[in-house]
Amino acid sequence: MFEGYPVDTANTAGDQAVTNYTINFGPQHPAAHGVLRMVMELDGEIIERVDPHVGLLHRGTEKLIEYKTYLQALPYFDRLDYCSPLGMEHSYVLAIEKLLDLEVPARAQYLRTMFAELTRICNHMLNIGSHVMDVGAMTPNLWVFELREDCLNFFERASGARMHSAYFRPGGVHQDVPEKLLVDIGEWVETRLPKLFGDAMSLVIDNRIFKQRNVDIATVSKEDALAWGFSGPMIRGSGIAWDLRKSQPYDAYAAMEFDIPVGTRGDCYDRFMVRVEEVYQSAKIIKQCLRDMPTGPIASLDRKVVPPKRGEMKQSMESLIHHFKLYTEGFHVPAGEVYVATESPKGEFGVYLVSDGTNKPYRCKIRPTAFSHLQAMDMMSKGHMLADTTAIIGAIDVVFGECDR
């Protein structure tokens, strides 16, 4: 057939002639958990290089905050990591209180701690459910979302809003919670949460397929985790028991007893299991908060920062004027700078606040959790299959409102 036609063996399409090719993962990919674009270089189905492109959800939050009073800037934090809004508010209000040298009443500290842990459970339900669904299991996601819905209902009963609650305020919390809500949270933590969550996890934890998709995927050593600036479940999954609630306790965490779950292999499965165990530890903290919850005021008595009560405004003209001035002009914060980090559900969330003595922040630098985790995508993905990308991103737990700011 080829008689008389010389065959150029050097350029024959074969194994030698196949070159690496580049694909775009996202920014519309359902497993990207937001607007993540990754330019991936593949050798067949093996990942050779990953170049994450972030910033597609950048809204200029840090600059917008400079044009708002300290209280008006608070709702911006709800909209950073919108899966765990109270975790974002926490760092910001603590930073303001540190600059003001403001004392927060014990009841407010316990309420904050309790709702911060409810937020952690709420966040982990979303991550665990979507991670499991990304690798092919549907049922557990539907079950854990029922628990997430319960958490959102608790937020609504406390603040009036399911997600963007703006419940933590400089000096304490916005309003006290009904006694019935505390009773319901106590019953939920004792009965519904362990039952439903235990049932959902029984389908996943020892599942052969789930383990094959996650064990030994994106292994990160202790040294690498430190070098890349990991925090939260990412660094604990690599075997380092670093938790700001223990090492630098804030609010009521110093009085709480809980364990820090850590992984042994530093792979996707360990990071998943750290979050599963954190749900049980959060439940333990919530029980302690409910047991030891003191009575008393829910906000500081410093009237230069905290507005008067609604009842006072209906009887006193001075209180009404005071309220109006606080919400229009805001309060003045002494000049200085402060960095406050809290253990948000995804890792260390920090706020660096610079005050020039006016009623608006001079500068507010936000230290997101996912930014330092995403920069390690290339290191974690190299040598794995394309299909493993979904498991790796799922185990990072990234939300782009917070990452891109």
UniProtKB/Swiss-Prot annotation:
Signal peptide: none annotated. Its EC number is 7.1.1.-. Gene3D superfamilies: Cytochrome-c3 Hydrogenase, chain B. It comes from the Bacteria. InterPro entries: NADH_Q_OxRdtase_suD (IPR001135), NADH_UbQ_OxRdtase_49kDa_CS (IPR014029), NDH1_su_D/H (IPR022885), NiFe-Hase_large (IPR029014). It is found in: Cell inner membrane. It is an enzyme of class 7 (translocase). One of its GO terms (cellular component) is plasma membrane. One of its GO terms (molecular function) is NAD binding. Pfam families: Complex1_49kDa (PF00346). It catalyses: a quinone + NADH + 5 H(+)(in) = a quinol + NAD(+) + 4 H(+)(out). NCBIfam families: NuoD, PRK06075.1. NDH-1 shuttles electrons from NADH, via FMN and iron-sulfur (Fe-S) centers, to quinones in the respiratory chain. The immediate electron acceptor for the enzyme in this species is believed to be ubiquinone. Couples the redox reaction to proton translocation (for every two electrons transferred, four hydrogen ions are translocated across the cytoplasmic membrane), and thus conserves the redox energy in a proton gradient. NDH-1 is composed of 14 different subunits. Subunits NuoB, C, D, E, F, and G constitute the peripheral sector of the complex. Belongs to the complex I 49 kDa subunit family. This is NADH-quinone oxidoreductase subunit D. The gene is nuoD.
